[in-house]
């Protein structure tokens, strides 16, 4: 019985290769425990049932491990996808010191998707309105009006209701089916017109519908032709007045994907839809779409603009001259102030008259105005706004009407008129306006200036001009204004070509304070340079004597022979050796010293014995001198 149970237990044991190491140990331990607790009295069926239960538990545990591993992978996959979405958000992922949680990131992603969907809906609303020509023909985006019966039939199918209309790019505003035959006959007889690539041309005259067309539309729903100045409600058929056509009507322009541009009027399209469908709410939808278009115009990074040509020969009022020539594409000229399409251009009230460069060149007046005029009044310490213009910015000579000249005044009478802001300064002054110095003063390059003063070129001037240069510029200017007539003491200041306002803004005052501090720091150096007289010729140095030449030639050798000796100690030892040397031994060193002094322009004594043709004798070797010093001195020298 016991042997059979062991045999059965081993036969029911699971395979080793299908279990992990932990599972394998559990099975072995359970089998061993079962063998230890074997009771011969227990029935054979109970032991088999326990083994089968253990085997089922192990199988369930393996299945759970397999299920957990894909969940971890899936969780990691979701986290990585969420991080990729978070990188697409136009916000920072950190708020202060905390990071955004996964839930917050998901909420931001959903809000961003809703924002994008709203913009997509606004863009679709633009493409719902497609082009119908003034004569009543149909044309899609980038299509000619008469291209064949098949395409005309496809575009002339009516729409069932406003809710079922689809916004496709190549569709057109739908018209009733009853006018299909009349429109086909008219489009066949009409000559095709070339497409326009820009909407700068003036709109053509709108042709009123023919009498037979009016008659055909009396029985059913009739669609009045679009009028150029319609604003969301139907109007009777009428052509634009000649005055509007002369000024050039600004209509909404759209570009298709093939870069073909055509004239489009949003409100007129909704007019046709409202009459066609006999529904009360298309006008409200038109107002919503117009608001969307206005929002899209403000949020576009590069809004499409329309160039309005300025012609000085035409009779234009002052308001049109003040207007910015780069007008938005959505602004009709005849729309009232309360219209949602009205976008008032920025008004610049400094340009008037005809023949201005902004009119001749067709450029924006903001290019010709000084940025100093746009500064707030809080920056200015007084109400003279032209001071900021002259101090901060340089006006180029394109402007015929400029602020008071910040340049050279040839006579004191012109100085008095400088504060009155002359409207027509002479051209000789306006030709020299581009030189800028680092101290915020604008120097003139005119030839009339005889003595332009600057702090760097005042080395040869008198002491009075140096004192005036060291003073702050605004003090010099106050002195000049207090004494406008040219006095002998201020003649140099009258000829000065700089002009500085009496009161400057705070940035200029700070800059001048720094410059003044730099001048004060450099002030003690200037008098020293001035007090120095003409430099005398350089004094000759003393002659090099024989002992100095002896030390130069033998000091290193002595230090090599006695390593560790200091240079001063070596000099003392050489001095003792020099005292012991005879005149014959010293003579070569003295001769070499005199030659060295003559070569280097030093003072040399004119002795009768010394001559230029002194023979150079080889000195006694140094080691021999040292050996002789080591010997005891002769008795007559002791």
Curated annotation (Swiss-Prot):
Residue ranges under compositional bias (Low complexity)? 157-167, 453-465
Q: Where is the composition biased (Polar residues)?
A: 7-20, 182-191
What are the Basic and acidic residues biased-composition ranges?
Answer: 412-430
One cellular component term from this protein's GO annotations in UniProt: nucleus
Where is the DNA-binding region? 540-608
Segments carrying the region annotation (Basic motif) are: 62-75
Keyword Zinc-finger attached: no
Localization of this protein? Nucleus
MF terms in GO? DNA binding; protein dimerization activity
Region described as Helix-loop-helix motif: spans on this chain? 76-116
Query: What is a single Pfam family found in this protein's UniProt entry?
Result: HMG_box
One GO term under biological process is: meiotic cell cycle
Q: Which SMART domains match?
A: HMG
UniProt keyword terms in alphabetical order: DNA-binding, Meiosis, Nucleus, Transcription, Transcription regulation
Q: Which residues form the bHLH domain?
A: 62-116
Residue segments, region Disordered: 1-21, 60-79, 138-249, 404-433, 447-537
Q: Which domain of life is it from?
A: Eukaryota
Compositionally biased, Basic residues: which spans?
Answer: 528-537
Instruction: Quote the PROSITE patterns the UniProt record gives.
Output: BHLH (PS50888), HMG_BOX_2 (PS50118)
Function recorded in the entry: Gatekeeper of meiotic initiation in both male and female germ cells. In complex with STRA8, directly activates the transcription of a subset of critical meiotic genes playing a central role in cell-cycle switching from mitosis to meiosis. Temporal expression of MEIOSIN is required for meiotic entry decision.
Q: Which PANTHER family match?
A: HIGH MOBILITY GROUP B PROTEIN 12-RELATED, MEIOSIS INITIATOR PROTEIN
User: Quaternary structure per UniProt?
Assistant: Interacts with STRA8.
Name assigned to this protein: Meiosis initiator protein
Please name the source species: Homo sapiens (Human)
